[in-house]
UniProtKB/Swiss-Prot annotation:
Its EC number is 3.1.3.87. Signal peptide: none annotated. Keywords: Amino-acid biosynthesis, Hydrolase, Methionine biosynthesis. GO terms for biological process: L-methionine salvage from methylthioadenosine. Pfam families: HAD. The lineage of its organism: Bacteria, Bacillati, Bacillota, Bacilli, Bacillales. Belongs to the HAD-like hydrolase superfamily. MtnX family. Pathway: Amino-acid biosynthesis; L-methionine biosynthesis via salvage pathway; L-methionine from S-methyl-5-thio-alpha-D-ribose 1-phosphate: step 4/6. This is 2-hydroxy-3-keto-5-methylthiopentenyl-1-phosphate phosphatase. SUPFAM superfamilies: HAD-like. PANTHER family: PHOSPHORIC MONOESTER HYDROLASE, UPF0655 PROTEIN YCR015C.
Amino acid sequence: MSKKLVLFCDFDGTITEKDNIVAIVRKFAPPEWEALTEQILSQKISVQEGVGKLFQLLPSSLRQDIIDFIVHEATIRPGFAEFVSYCREEGIELLITSGGIDFFLEPILAPFDLADVPIYCNGSDFSGERITITWPNACDEHCTNGCGMCKTTIIRRYDPATHFRIVIGDSITDLAGAKIADYVIARSFLADKAEELQLPHSTFATFHDVIRILQQVQQEVV
């Protein structure tokens, strides 16, 4: 029986060339951000705890300054628009699964035709003195990682008996999802981990590469 392809595509460092949260805190946060980031990357604290604390360093009054900065700063990885079109033409289900925050993610993606693409990310609350992150897609009972935006929770909604589940990503926040996916399209840290853990994977530099990989996968799976 053929399976339906479903893609879980990361945002920071995958759709965009660089990690936008790091760019934002480097620009706007006091020096404490570096120690917090190191604790997240070394897994001493959860992503949810760390990202929440990072944004608590930032006054809510900076909202528009941050948006203006990151929309100008963010570079979309080549081939993304073509990748979205390819998924649409081929009937491949695409979800954007991001540990990023709605208030900067949505303006960056605004130029693209994503009306039919579900976007899962963290929320934001500017009603207090400092930015508070909200977690509408937190971990389910099967995950204890404190992901914030739990990619494995979303992946588990798709039955592997009927769906071929592909994670596209680059970093530590994609690793748990990659471990339960059927296939991984990876770069940077995630590519090294996929190799180390012997996960079925291909590597990519642009979304043109991703399209080529999907064409190969389709021949084998669909």
